[in-house]
Amino acid sequence: MSEIIQDLSLEDVIGDRFGRYSKYIIQERALPDVRDGLKPVQRRILFAMYSSGNTYDKNFRKSAKTVGDVIGQYHPHGDSSVYDAMVRLSQDWKLRHVLIEMHGNNGSIDNDPPAAMRYTEAKLSQLSEELLRDINKETVSFIPNYDDTTLEPMVLPARFPNLLINGSTGISSGYATDIPPHNLAEVIQGTLKYIDQPDITINQLMKYIKGPDFPTGGIIQGIEGIKKAYETGKGKVVVRSRVDEEPLRSGRKQLIVTEIPYEVNKSSLVKKIDELRADKKVDGIVEVRDETDRTGLRIAIELKKDANSESIKNYLYKNSDLQISYNFNMVAISEGRPKLMGLREIIESYLNHQIEVVTNRTRYDLEQAEKRMHIVEGLMKALSILDEVIALIRNSKNKKDAKDNLVAEYDFTEAQAEAIVMLQLYRLTNTDIEALKKEHEELEALIKELRNILDNHEALLAVIKDELNEIKKKFKVDRLSTIEAEISEIKIDKEVMVPSEEVILSLTQHGYIKRTSTRSFNASGVTEIGLKDGDRLLKHESVNTQDTVLVFTNKGRYLFIPVHKLADIRWKELGQHISQIVPIDEDEEVVNVYNEKDFKNEAFYIMATKNGMIKKSSASQFKTTRFNKPLINMKVKDKDELINVVRLESDQLITVLTHKGMSLTYSTNELSDTGLRAAGVKSINLKDEDYVVMTEDVNDSDSIIMVTQRGAMKRIDFNVLQEAKRAQRGITLLKELKKKPHRIVAGAVVKENHTKYIVFSQHHEEYGNIDDVHLSEQYTNGSFIIDTDDFGEVESMILE
């Protein structure tokens, strides 16, 4: 044999071969036919079982035999693919109406594998026989099988709209399909209405076909998504589990899940919910149990005594497959091509198929009836001249001679002559003669009826309607899925997501932040905090994990950080730098931190800058949902910076202290509530290159402590301060020296809880008791506590 060598480019070969492969996958494997709702392997399985008599009214038969028949005659692929498809057709959590009944382990909603095919037994379900009914009446086209040894149907007669009733899912080259199951009675009713009113709208159709009806039940939300899918073939709905509350002893309760979304793995769902509980992602769940048994699906979620069951349920809806989004993608093979189809198109294609099936069946029945009529007429004629016929047959040489003589002598046809010579003697009684007359009358009526169906389109549609109504009456079942018009908004209370726990928040001057358990803090003490060289603790306080931290920076920005998102770090260890949580500029520094519980309107923040600007903003303005970037809390001009932020519950006095020892005290009610992007107003009238070193709230039980660059500390009583108006010059708190004048580098208001001070110089930290610092007069410079010649100038101070 001579070889044929073609010189082709690799690009052309690959493109051509992949195109052929894709066409095969699309048409012959992954996508269902719109007419019978079946993929080729499913159709071959059902036809093989029907052909071998493995039907509903017979006994179960080993699945392996069916798989062997399918592989041997119709589907030359691996046995596992055939058996898997066969098993799916028997799973009542996958199909709304199973097409195969199976004895033995056919898998589970937990995605457990089925038993091997040598152990399971199967037969067609009663409904699946309606897919195959009349297939032997030339209703559908047959094609040769893969080795031309037998024929297989291109499509099944499908006496009900299986594509909509059982749905389909599949992925092929460039195409995917997701068609949900529907209620049989609703689909048939919708089809009947379409037959009566071909121009029916989607809105009108949805009065009958309300939406998907999943075998696993559940609650479907989003009428608009259903409508869009029915109009265009694509749409989206939310499917959520059916969850009820059940009381337990001692006032506790549990959530009981009895229905889950379609195609959700139950065991994976239980595992996920338990992981959320174990990882403390949700607070209030004691235990998760799978209590499913032969009576039905049941997942028990036991709750703590005072748990917010509604919020826990909503959290699970959002963070587990207790609720999913189902995306319609109604692609099916129509006229040999994949097509995205709406509801009307699917029903129209099915109806056209039924018109063809009923027409072909009627032609077949008419042909058979006419053939029988011809035979009956011949028998009746023969019986009317019985003696002559008998004599002719007796005088004939053989059967063929008798037939030829009958045709020649009495004008019988070949078929009639065959029937006459095959007639048994007992059929010559009067009873059988009358039976032939009756059969003749019945055949006349049948032929008339069949011809009317073929000639009258309305009569043909009436047949389709009658047969659909018959199936509806026989197989009608109640809807399992509930449809709700709107998609529910999921609201989750913070306490459900975050276990309530008191922790210690700490922030250093260099921007290291952490939360620490009270146990670790108490075991170490404040002074044992982990710090980098040169860093100092700016603030520490007790907060709750459900609180929110607001970290303010010198650039007039704040960071919004939920406490539970802070790393849980031991007190002796270094914290996490703020820039690792929210990115900030390299030269940006933290100035203060506060925790918020509820961002209530009554509270407000006072923000003050180095160059004497101040503003007031209500706490509610700081609430946000953005955690990933700094947010503006004050517009700060160039060469200025934010030096402090004070949180107050109500209006009270604040005092401003400057570098040159000026002090101004006034009420915050002089400040209007402004937006976060405002620049503020003048706080104090600064002169001679002076700047603000402190702005804090103050009341009559407080004192003010300050330290100068020369190492002197001074403490004054509240009474020294003089309440004035905003933007004034203020009073002088230092005695001005001509040589080496004192300049304030740090100041603080001493509250009742303050007992100690720490003063930081360039090379030294000075600790002392606040009570040991005596109260001074207005025009003094205080007492020296640090020798700056030995330890360098003072830089800062904190109170504890």
Swiss-Prot record:
Gene3D superfamilies, alphabetized: 3.30.1360.40, DNA gyrase/topoisomerase IV, subunit A, C-terminal, Topoisomerase II, domain 5, Topoisomerase, domain 3
Pfam families for the chain: DNA_gyraseA_C, DNA_topoisoIV
Identification of the protein by name: DNA topoisomerase 4 subunit A
InterPro entries: GyrA/parC_rep (IPR006691), Gyrase/topoIV_suA_C (IPR035516), Topo_IIA-like_dom_sf (IPR013760), Topo_IIA_A/C_ab (IPR013758), Topo_IIA_A_a_sf (IPR013757), Topo_IIA_dom_A (IPR002205), TopoIV_A_Gpos (IPR005741), Type_II_DNA_Topoisomerases (IPR050220)
Gene symbol of the encoding locus: parC
Organism whose genome encodes this protein: Staphylococcus epidermidis (strain ATCC 12228 / FDA PCI 1200)
Compartments where found: Cell membrane
Signal peptide region: none
An example Gene Ontology molecular-function term: DNA binding
Residues of the active site: 119 (o-(5'-phospho-dna)-tyrosine intermediate)
Function: Topoisomerase IV is essential for chromosome segregation. It relaxes supercoiled DNA. Performs the decatenation events required during the replication of a circular DNA molecule.
GO BP field: chromosome segregation; DNA topological change
SUPFAM superfamilies in UniProt: GyrA/ParC C-terminal domain-like, Type II DNA topoisomerase
